[in-house]
């Protein structure tokens, strides 16, 4: 029960003891039992549904801060209708202990599995050397390629990450050398109906062909494919690679070819098109430092930036001391949640201190970089590419946002990264910085966001490209799929890529796993205590 404020139109005077009209409660794991008992106080349990979004969060490790809470929620749960929603929910047969436990608690349980997949977008998987990867250019033996095709047929969500151009090239090769069985030739398979030839259908057709290629032909097919592969973003360099003769730019371009295109603030920036990029790594600080180092900012310019940052930091230190003095003068009334202007300060001393704080903040220097250093600005592209790439994504760091960041008590490294259009979600105590990065991510104004693998859950920011760091080689297959799901979430087909810094992660993605840590952990946690 609540009342509407006549002036503002807002909701006020809410009486939470009356819950008969409450139809939905959104809560986190720690609040679940409270929310459950509240809803049970006003509703028949058989008419309530618990919708558990992303139940595999935290299930990819043996120990996690949420495990105890999750176990208690499951053990004490009284609601017989439950939806577990996840793109990587383990198969039913892997969750039998959990299912049997649920059946033992509630009568007449009906189990329903709903599966869907979307492969109407093409998101290219790029390996550490810069090549576009599909099953047909990964596996040397026919047994391996056949097993992979069978696995992908069972898990069609993986088709989303098969590059359509590579698939079509492969099919054309098979057709040219008459390696397609008669009944699987395109005209027969698609029944001469051009309306059936869609992206989804082509990718399923591709899986069928992989399983029906003559086994004796596979060695020569694989050899041809490997020898004719080209890097997705290959740019020829017309100079001899000699460190004594080449400029920094030419050296960087040479390094780019050898490294698979990882110089994202210089030679490879133009390959990040249409929208922001997310870089997943557990070594967030290391990657951030790498991109500052590789940004080709001259020492004189960099020293000037550091000089201004040092001056700003000295001013911020004085501001912090004055704010502490002001808080004491006001009897610790001022807080982070209550901002006070000079007009509200009654003490003459408090007014004086407040004016000093304002004067000091006005002295904080705003910083910006010359466009020549900002990824994909025209001036930047004039250095790094022979022709302007119109689709190349450009960060947008306005002066007001830059000034807000400069005023924060924050590592200088993070401030410089933001000037480059790079935000960082690392563990640090400055909430204001995190909120600025979130705001800019939502507005698609950042070039790259560097974050840990746990960031993949619960974000709907739209990314066009993703880098998965080599330090994530032990990431589970299910979590890798979750990570890939951050790319291509809008409604149109653009140039999407997922770039892996370790090829083993790609192999793990496309091979049947002997164990499933998410399933094992769920079966361990989602079992009721004996006394329940």
Q: Could you tell me what each predicted segment is?
A:
Residues 1-37, 128:
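Inter-Walker segment of RecA-like/P-loop motor cores
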Residues 7-15, 407-411, 420-452:
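Conserved helicase ATPase core of P-loop NTP-dependent helicases/translocases
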Residues 22, 27-33, 40-83:
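SF2 helicase catalytic motif II
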Residues 29-30, 54-58, 446, 455, ...:
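Conserved Walker B
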Residues 92-384:
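Conserved interdomain linker/interface between the two RecA-like ATPase lobes of SF2 helicase motors
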């Amino acid at each position: 029960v609540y009342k509407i404020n006549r002036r503002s139109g807002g909701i006020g005077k809410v009486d939470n003891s009356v819950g008969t009209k409450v139809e939905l409660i959104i809560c986190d794991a720690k609040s679940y039992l409270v929310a459950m008992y509240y809803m049970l106080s006003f509703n028949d349990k058989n008419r309530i549904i618990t919708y558990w979004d992303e139940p595999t969060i935290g299930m990819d490790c043996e120990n996690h801060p949420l495990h105890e809470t999750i176990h208690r929620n499951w053990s004490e749960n009284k609601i017989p209708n439950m939806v577990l929603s996840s793109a990587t929910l383990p198969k039913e047969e892997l969750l039998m202990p959990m299912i049997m436990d649920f059946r033992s608690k509630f009568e007449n349980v009906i189990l329903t599995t709903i599966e869907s997949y979307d492969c109407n977008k093409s998101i290219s998987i790029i390996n550490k050397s810069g090549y576009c990867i599909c099953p047909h250019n990964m596996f040397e033996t026919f047994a391996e390629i056949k097993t992979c095709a069978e696995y992908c047929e069972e898990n069609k969500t993986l088709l989303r990450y098969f590059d359509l151009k590579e698939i079509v090239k492969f099919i054309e090769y098979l057709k040219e050398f008459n390696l397609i069985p008669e009944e699987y030739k395109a005209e027969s398979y698609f029944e001469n109906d051009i309306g059936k030839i869609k992206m989804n259908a082509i990718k399923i057709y591709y899986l069928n062909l992989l399983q029906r290629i003559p086994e004796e032909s596979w060695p020569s097919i694989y050899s041809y494919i490997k020898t004719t592969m080209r890097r997705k973003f290959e740019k020829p360099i017309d100079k001899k690679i000699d460190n004594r003769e080449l400029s920094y730019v030419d050296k960087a371009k040479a390094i780019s070819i050898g490294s698979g295109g990882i110089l994202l603030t210089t030679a490879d920036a133009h390959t990040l098109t249409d929208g922001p990029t997310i870089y997943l790594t557990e070594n967030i600080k290391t990657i951030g430092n790498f991109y500052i180092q590789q940004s080709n900012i001259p020492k004189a310019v960099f020293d000037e930036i550091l000089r201004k940052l040092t001056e700003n930091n000295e001013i911020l230190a004085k501001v912090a001391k004055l704010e502490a003095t002001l808080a004491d003068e006001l009897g610790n009334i001022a807080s982070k949640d209550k901002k006070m202007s000079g007009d509200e300060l009654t003490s003459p001393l408090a007014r004086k201190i407040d004016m000093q704080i304002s004067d000091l903040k006005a002295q904080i220097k705003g910083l910006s970089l010359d466009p020549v250093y900002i990824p994909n600005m025209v001036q930047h592209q004039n250095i790094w590419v022979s022709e302007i790439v119109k689709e190349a994504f450009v960060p947008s760091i306005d002066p007001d946002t830059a000034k807000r960041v400069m005023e924060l008590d924050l590592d200088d490294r993070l401030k410089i990264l933001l000037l480059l259009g790079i935000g960082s979600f690392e563990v640090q105590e400055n909430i204001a910085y995190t909120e600025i990065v979130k705001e800019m991510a939502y507005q698609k104004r950042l070039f790259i966001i560097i974050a840990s693998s746990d960031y993949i859950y619960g974000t709907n920011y739209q990314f066009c490209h993703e880098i998965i760091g080599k330090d994530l080689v032990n990431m589970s297959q299910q979590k890798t799929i979750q990570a890939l799901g951050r790319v291509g979430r809008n409604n149109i087909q653009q140039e999407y890529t997922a770039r892996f810094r370790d090829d083993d992660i790609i192999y793990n993605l496309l091979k049947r796993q002997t164990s499933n840590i998410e399933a094992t952990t769920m079966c361990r946690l989602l079992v009721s205590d004996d006394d329940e």
